[in-house]
């Protein structure tokens, strides 16, 4: 399974004229890759994810998953937003199943499997208002992975959470990745998060958004954020922002 992003450019039409958001984005992912995308605000990271997800088909270039051009959403792509976007009138297990029927034994068994993987045992019948924000994001992760997508796209899914919950969900996500080897593209503003999670870090520059640098991350798992090797890689990434002219409002 491969994901190929070839020559992707994106323009928005505004009252003041045409604005280019992405310029000639090219990269490939092999099965089981975990890639993080990081860059200044406004560099088009989220726009790129929406294109790969098939949520935006008004672009130049091509996105191909398993040899098939992507122009619409499909079961090949799972998407997790910063907000969990759960249906408040559905229980945890019903949200995970989404439009699939829990009366189907296969669906019921799959939902039960994912409830266990994301550690929500005992909360299957709970409603979103009865669980925490971190638990709600675990439901969103399970929902996105229930259909076994070829690639999971994550748009700053832990950005609004407190540090302790974010750290816990990073571990949950890594455990899932190690078990399932789902290919992942994860957008973040957090350099430590990018280094901790992925095996490749794509650094983007802004206006228009383009790939500034790709850094291979060969640190062994599990990773220690206080280790010398982690800090050395962190310095290497930071230098791209400091000396590459990428720092604007935030990283």
Curated annotation (Swiss-Prot):
Transmembrane segments: none annotated. Its EC number is 7.6.2.14. It is an enzyme of class 7 (translocase). Residues 3-231 form the ABC transporter domain. It catalyses: ATP + H2O + aliphatic sulfonate-[sulfonate-binding protein]Side 1 = ADP + phosphate + aliphatic sulfonateSide 2 + [sulfonate-binding protein]Side 1. PANTHER family: ALIPHATIC SULFONATES IMPORT ATP-BINDING PROTEIN SSUB, TAURINE IMPORT ATP-BINDING PROTEIN-RELATED. Belongs to the ABC transporter superfamily. Aliphatic sulfonates importer (TC 3.A.1.17.2) family. Part of the ABC transporter complex SsuABC involved in aliphatic sulfonates import. Responsible for energy coupling to the transport system. This is Aliphatic sulfonates import ATP-binding protein SsuB. The gene is ssuB.
């Amino acid at each position: 399974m491969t994901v190929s992003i070839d020559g992707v450019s994106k323009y928005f039409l505004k009252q003041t004229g045409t604005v280019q958001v992405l310029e000639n984005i090219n990269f490939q992912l092999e099965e089981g890759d975990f890639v993080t995308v990081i860059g200044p605000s406004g560099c088009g990271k989220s726009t790129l994810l929406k294109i790969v997800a098939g949520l935006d088909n008004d672009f130049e270039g091509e996105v191909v998953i398993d040899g098939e051009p992507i122009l619409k959403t499909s079961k090949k792509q799972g998407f997790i937003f910063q907000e969990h976007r759960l249906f408040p009138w559905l229980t945890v297990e019903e949200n995970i199943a989404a439009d699939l029927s829990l009366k189907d034994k296969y669906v019921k068994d799959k939902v039960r499997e994912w409830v266990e993987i994301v550690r929500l045992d005992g909360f299957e019948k709970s409603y979103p208002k009865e669980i925490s924000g971190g638990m709600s994001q675990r439901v969103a992760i399970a929902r996105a992975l229930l259909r076994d997508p070829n690639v999971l796209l994550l748009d700053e899914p832990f950005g609004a959470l407190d540090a302790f919950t974010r750290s816990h969900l990073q571990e949950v996500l890594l455990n899932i990745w190690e078990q399932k080897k789902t290919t992942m593209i994860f957008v973040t503003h957090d350099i430590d998060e990018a280094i901790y999670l992925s095996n490749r870090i794509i650094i983007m520059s802004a206006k228009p958004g383009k790939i500034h640098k790709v850094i291979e991350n060969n640190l062994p798992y599990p990773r220690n954020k206080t280790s010398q090797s982690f800090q050395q890689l962190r310095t290497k990434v930071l230098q791209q922002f400091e000396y590459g002219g990428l720092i604007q409002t935030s990283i």
